[in-house]
């Protein structure tokens, strides 16, 4: 197979506005029949690229795994054969191993195939994980060579742990409860993991239940947090004990409404009751910035009048929580607002608000450098009546102080292009004084910086090309994006058709997958 790999390195500085340095570009030929790449963030260890090669060996098909270092130089390449009917649904990364999760069929299955790729010797082992019931998988991660699978059996949450070295599967007790929803599964810095569950029953007091387990599934801690009876928790994320405190943050609504009314936050403490802090959207400084000034002011004024009368404001919208970042200065929640565009008579999306392979980190169920993240509610699954497209409205970052209370926020208006699946459109990094949000629009990279004193810097640049004389003939819609990598670094990816006018006519045009390292501050 002919492969074209090009590395282009350039150092530049834009002295005005936000600073954007596009440091290097990786390219590889992308033919029309090729599958898209799944990008796995390995932080300071680089990135991994995984895809179905669309080639077969006997009755099996071939997956390829390509690793790049932080300079985007290829550091390893491996091919592995798997059963022909499986497809990639998730991934995870640890310091020593890369994990790829595959399955055959759709939705609820009784077994999955796990690939364990050794980053040192580039060898791959396969593990067939079977259980006696169909599990609709919503979360996947790995802790100390224990694969943690979570989801729903019928409408009841379930958590399974597969001991990889011993090939033993265990069902974690304490779940399989009706009228409950699994909101989060998160690995902690101290070698434990959290689950976050909320009950949906109107016949009992509503609660958030946080549990912490060791890698083998032994419960170490439980914290039950009461929820205001007129409110419903829609989504929630837990921090991962980078700090001593653990924050739970997400969205809530009033009653049984499906759209969010605002954000909530609470510090977990199993030894004393901690109040949940609720913030309607109009209380945030910049959440409504995607609207016209007139409309935003009207919502803020109306919401203020409701609060003065001890009533809940009426404004609601759809919000997807993406990740919860921990810093010395506190906690930072990335969330994105969106609207739904309903199309009748087309049948339901089987996974409700998200497509069946959606992850806020672009890789189905599973890994981000911060946590596993794939939210999938059985309530939207069973109640979704029509098919919906999505229009992203804005990306917001909320900064919480160490005591768990909202401190300040930043937002960036999103492209309102209609999409068939809900996808993360931007990412961020931060320190105690500023929040940097980056996003991609076709062949442009957009960066906006907000300082805590409310000063704003921003800039838009064309995405780095292999050669200054190259002409981008086409940028594939719906493919590509921006993700935070490590430190103040992002990576940007996409698919382009590029013309090089300096080459012979028959060699001028190439179709490529590209990956760019960006320093934005």
Q: Can you name each region flagged by the protein language model?
A:
Residues 22-30, 74-80, 123-129, 168-175, ...:
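A short beta-strand motif characteristic of beta-propeller blades
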């Amino acid at each position: 197979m002919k492969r074209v790999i090009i590395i282009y390195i350039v150092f530049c500085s834009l002295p005005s506005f936000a600073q954007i340095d596009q440091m290097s570009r990786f390219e590889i030929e992308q033919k029309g029949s090729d599958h898209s790449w799944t990008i796995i963030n390995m932080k300071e260890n680089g990135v991994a690229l995984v895809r179905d090669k669309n080639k077969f060996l006997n009755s099996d098909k071939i997956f390829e795994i390509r690793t790049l270092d932080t300079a985007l130089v290829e550091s390893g390449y491996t091919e592995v054969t798997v059963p022909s009917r499986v497809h990639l649904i998730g991934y995870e990364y640890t310091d020593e191993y890369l994990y790829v999760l595959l399955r055959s069929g759709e939705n609820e299955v009784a077994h999955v195939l796990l690939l364990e790729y050794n980053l040192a010797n580039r060898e791959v082992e396969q593990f067939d994980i079977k259980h006696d019931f169909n599990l609709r998988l919503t979360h996947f991660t790995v802790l100390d060579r224990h694969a943690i699978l979570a989801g729903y059996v019928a409408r009841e949450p379930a958590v399974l742990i597969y001991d990889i070295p011993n090939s033993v599967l265990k069902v974690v007790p304490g779940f399989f409860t009706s009228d409950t929803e699994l909101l989060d599964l998160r690995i902690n810095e101290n070698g434990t993991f959290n689950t976050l569950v909320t009950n949906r029953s109107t016949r009992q007091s509503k609660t958030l239940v946080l549990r912490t387990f060791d890698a083998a599934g032994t419960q170490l801690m439980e914290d039950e947090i009461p929820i205001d009876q007129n409110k419903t928790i829609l989504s929630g994320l837990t921090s991962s004990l980078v700090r001593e405190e653990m924050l739970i943050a997400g969205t809530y609504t009033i009653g049984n409404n499906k759209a969010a009314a605002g954000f909530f936050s609470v510090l977990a403490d199993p030894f004393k009751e901690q109040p949940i802090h609720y913030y309607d959207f109009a209380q945030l400084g910049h959440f409504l910035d995607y609207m016209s000034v007139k409309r935003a002011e009207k919502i803020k004024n109306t919401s203020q009048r409701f609060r003065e009368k001890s009533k809940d404001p009426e404004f609601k919208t759809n919000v997807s929580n993406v990740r919860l970042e921990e810093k010395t200065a506190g906690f930072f929640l990335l969330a994105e607002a969106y609207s739904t565009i309903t199309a009748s008579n087309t049948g339901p999306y089987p996974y409700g608000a998200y497509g069946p392979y959606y992850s806020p980190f672009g890789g189905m169920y599973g890994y981000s450098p911060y946590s596993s993240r794939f939210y999938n509610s059985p309530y939207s699954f069973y109640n979704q009546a029509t098919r919906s497209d999505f229009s992203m409205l804005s990306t917001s970052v909320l900064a919480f102080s160490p005591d768990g209370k909202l401190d300040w926020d930043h937002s960036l208006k999103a492209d309102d292009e209609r999409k068939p699946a809900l996808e993360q459109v931007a990412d961020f990094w931060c320190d105690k004084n500023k929040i940097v949000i980056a996003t991609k629009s076709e062949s442009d990279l957009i960066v906006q910086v907000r300082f805590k004193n409310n000063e704003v810097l921003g800039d838009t640049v064309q995405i780095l090309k292999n050669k200054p004389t190259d002409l981008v003939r086409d940028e594939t819609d719906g493919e590509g994006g921006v993700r935070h990598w490590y430190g103040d670094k992002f990576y940007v990816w996409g698919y382009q058709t590029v013309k090089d006018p300096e080459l012979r006519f028959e060699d001028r045009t190439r179709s490529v997958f590209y990956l760019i390292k960006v320093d934005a501050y």
